[in-house]
């Protein structure tokens, strides 16, 4: 039942942790605190393809991660999205937004991303991991 993570995600994101259903990865864009949840199920492209138990678990994990992102990055606004036009593998974006970020109120995709420096990447991953351990 375990799903392999798309090569695109491996190239453009960093592993944070595994939850019961989803793998959590940090998108390599230092402009925005941005994680993706990737369900560990084979050949799934849409939420409706998950069984009802996994649909409920996915919702719980989305809500859990959303609360953590708000707490960690001290934001009041999140973008929670399931798009999948470029990478069809089911994944959910959770992006902490601010009225002060570079594209507010537009989409994060309207500007080119900025990869994390090695130092900031380690710091950000450790910051997020800490909350998953609590």
Per-range role (PLM):
Residues 1-134:
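HIT superfamily nucleotide-processing domains
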């Amino acid at each position: 039942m375990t799903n392999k993570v798309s090569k695109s995600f491996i190239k453009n994101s960093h592993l944070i942790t595994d939850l019961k259903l989803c793998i959590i990865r940090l998108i390599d864009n230092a402009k925005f605190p941005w994680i993706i949840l990737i369900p560990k199920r084979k050949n799934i492209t849409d939420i409706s393809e998950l069984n009802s138990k996994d649909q409920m678990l996915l919702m719980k994990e989305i809500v859990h991660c959303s609360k953590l992102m708000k707490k960690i990055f001290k934001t009041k606004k999140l973008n929670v999205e399931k798009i999948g036009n470029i990478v069809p593998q089911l994944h959910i974006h959770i992006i902490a937004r601010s009225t002060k970020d570079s594209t507010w109120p537009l989409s994060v995709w309207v500007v080119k991303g900025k990869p994390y420096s090695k130092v900031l990447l380690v710091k950000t991953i450790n910051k997020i991991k800490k909350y998953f351990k609590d």
